Amino acid sequence: MIRPLLVQTMIAGVLFVLTATAYAETVNSNADLANSKKTVAYIYSRPMVDALYRLAIEQDKKFGLQQNCKSQYGVEPYSIVVLQPIDFPDNKQHPIKGIWNFRYQIHRCGESKFYNALFIASGTGETPPTPRAYFPGTSNASPLLIKDTMVAALVRASSQSGLKDCKEIDVFDMRVTEDAHDVTEEGKTHRGVWNETWTFRLCGKMFDVPITFIPDATGGGTSFVIHSAKSTEAAAKP
């Protein structure tokens, strides 16, 4: 397996840090990562990157991507989001608590794709965290917001595609189409509004669902508006 130089360099540093440190860390949010060298080293360690590689292979197979590709896969870490606090005791080889999302880009045969993986701590610290494939792409929405939005987006894609009876439905991609900006309507300004497009594969056909996310000015959450679904020209691979 061939990895980009960035990943190779990270792993070299990680191996040293992991063998040289033996102290406890608690990472409550992304803001704590800058001062949590042990945890960061663990997250970017070879076993974690290898898990990303295996998940990417599974995801490519699921989506029918690059099945005839003979080149090696490159795994490029992109970002980490701490979803639940990570507890890493000094006497454990693995964290005992915590969930984090690892966004990464896979490179193969001249093409690349963003995938996401959720890592869930085992609870004992005796075994590695469990990696689970999450929705692909680069959405800025939190997992909770994605969950709240998903049903409405699926209904829109299904109803407007004419494939209401389709049972083979996958989220193929999520991407930001317009970064956070201010929107003024009827004299009221909404700040931090952003737009995304979610691509669904329904029975071998692709449909884009544009979504507008509107953060509440008082911090009460984020609302969303689902726009009309559009068929894409590129057909999904079986």
Regions found by a protein language model. Give the residues of each.
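Bacterial N-terminal signal peptides that target proteins for export
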Residues: M1-M10
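Bacterial N-terminal signal peptides
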Residues: T9-L18
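Sec/Tat signal peptide C-region and signal peptidase I cleavage site
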Residues: A20-A24
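Cysteine-centric segments in proteins
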Residues: E25-P238
